[in-house]
Design a protein with these regions (language model features):
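Helical transmembrane-bundle signal
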Residues: 16-26
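N-terminal pre-ligand scaffold of iron-sulfur
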Residues: 9, 25-114, 120-126, 155-175
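N-terminal secretory signal peptides and thylakoid transit peptides that target proteins
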Residues: 1-15
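Short cysteine-rich clusters marking metal-coordination/redox-active sites
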Residues: 115, 133
Length: 175
């Protein structure tokens, strides 16, 4: 038989454990990854014509997908002396973008549309041959590489992605 003192002790322990669980729940929930948030996005490129830009929202950020013209592709090899980081050594990008095009395919360029200075939304300047930041007038070439005269410290950030087919692009968030 359990005496009164032991019974009260067990009741207090049970209430304390229950309270600790209720207190810990919000912290544990915040630390666990959100399973309802989609970490991949499939983008159809069949309607993207040469010289056009498609903008999609993914994981709370805007992503620009540019279909480059042959002139823009050939122009990427020129004027490297005007760029801060022409080889993209100091840029945030996956290994797939470690080339002069900063993309898997020379004709399709995928980039976050946030300036690397203060995060303003960059826009294409008439054509996709260059990007401009409206906040501090930083300029980027067709591969998102920043010019030396710009305020932005590094090139535009390239997300991780892969091609599922010639016309389907999959944006992927890797851990």
């Amino acid at each position: 038989m359990v005496d009164r003192r032991t019974l009260l002790l067990r009741i207090v322990q049970a209430f304390s454990a229950t309270g600790a669980l209720f207190l810990a729940y919000p912290f544990v929930k915040a630390w666990l990854p959100t399973f309802n948030q989609q970490h991949t996005l499939e983008v159809d490129l069949s309607d993207l014509k040469i010289g056009e830009i498609k903008q999609v929202s993914w994981l709370g950020r805007n992503v620009m997908i540019v279909r480059r013209t042959p002139e823009e592709i050939s122009g990427l090899a020129e004027d490297k002396h005007e760029l801060k980081d022409a080889s993209s050594v100091h840029s945030r990008q996956p290994a797939l973008a470690a080339n002069q095009y900063r993309s898997l395919r020379p004709d399709v360029f995928v980039v976050y549309s946030n300036c690397t200075h203060l995060g303003c939304e960059v826009s294409a300047s008439g054509t996709a041959a260059s990007f401009n930041c409206p906040c501090h007038l930083s300029e980027f070439d067709a591969a998102g590489r920043v010019y030396k005269s710009a305020v932005a410290p590094v090139n535009l950030e390239v997300p991780d992605y892969q091609f599922m087919s010639r016309k389907i692009l999959l944006l992927v968030k890797r851990a």
